[in-house]
C-alpha cells in the first residue's frame, strides 16, 4: 500500500470539512410527505398521476413514523416542519393519528389541501392532533378556479375552508 501524498491528504481533508459544513450549514428544516396519490379533483395543471382511486397503495402510517423516528436523533424536532401532501391528504382516514404521533414526537406539522374535505369537524380533529400549518390551494376567481380544478363547487368549498381557518389562532400560516 502506498502512502497518500500531502496533496491528496489535503484534498481529502478539505472534502471532509466541506461535507461536514454542509450538514451544519443546511440543516433539515422542512420534510414533505406525499402520503397518498389519491385525489378528489382532476386539475388541468397538475402533473401528477393522482386520481380518486390509485393503483399505488398509500404508505402505511407506521412506515412513515419509522422514517421519522430514524431522523429524530439527528435533528431538533421542533425545528423541522413536516408538511403532508398528496394527492389530497384528507382522503386518508388516519391523518389525525399521524398528526398526533408527530405532535407527540415534538414535530410541528401541517398539510396542503384543496379544502373540499375540510369540514368543521375535520378541522377540529386536526387541530386536536396538533395541526400547526395548513395551505389551501386557490387558483383565482371562481370561474377560473373551478375550470382548473375540474369541479363546479371547488372554489366555494376552498373558500369555506379558508374562512374556517381564519378563526383558528393556533395556526401559524
Residue map of PLM features:
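Hydrophobic alpha-helical segments
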Residues: 96, 137, 155-158
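Conserved strand-turn element in the central/C-terminal portion of the radical SAM core barrel
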Residues: 162-173
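Conserved radical SAM core fold
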Residues: 89-90, 115-120, 137-152
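Alpha-helix N-cap and loop-to-helix initiation/capping positions
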Residues: 56-59, 63, 149-157
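Conserved alpha-helical substructure of the radical SAM core
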Residues: 2-133
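Residues within alpha-helical segments
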Residues: 36, 146, 159-162
Amino acid at each position: 500500500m502506498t502512502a497518500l501524498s500531502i496533496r491528496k491528504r489535503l484534498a481529502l481533508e478539505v472534502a471532509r470539512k466541506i461535507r461536514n459544513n454542509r450538514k451544519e450549514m443546511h440543516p433539515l428544516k422542512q420534510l414533505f410527505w406525499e402520503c397518498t396519490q389519491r385525489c378528489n379533483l382532476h386539475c388541468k395543471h397538475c402533473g401528477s398521476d393522482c386520481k380518486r382511486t390509485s393503483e399505488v397503495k398509500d404508505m402505511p402510517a407506521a412506515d412513515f413514523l419509522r422514517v421519522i423516528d430514524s431522523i429524530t436523533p439527528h435533528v431538533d424536532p421542533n425545528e423541522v416542519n413536516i408538511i403532508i401532501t398528496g394527492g389530497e391528504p384528507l382522503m386518508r382516514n388516519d391523518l389525525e393519528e399521524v398528526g398526533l404521533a408527530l405532535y407527540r414526537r415534538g414535530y410541528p406539522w401541517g398539510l396542503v389541501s384543496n379544502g373540499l374535505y375540510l369540514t368543521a369537524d375535520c378541522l377540529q380533529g386536526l387541530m386536536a392532533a396538533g395541526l400547526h400549518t395548513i395551505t389551501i390551494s386557490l387558483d383565482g376567481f371562481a370561474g377560473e378556479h373551478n375550470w382548473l380544478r375540474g369541479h363546479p363547487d371547488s372554489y366555494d368549498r376552498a373558500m369555506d375552508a379558508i374562512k374556517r381557518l381564519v378563526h383558528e389562532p393556533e395556526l401559524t400560516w
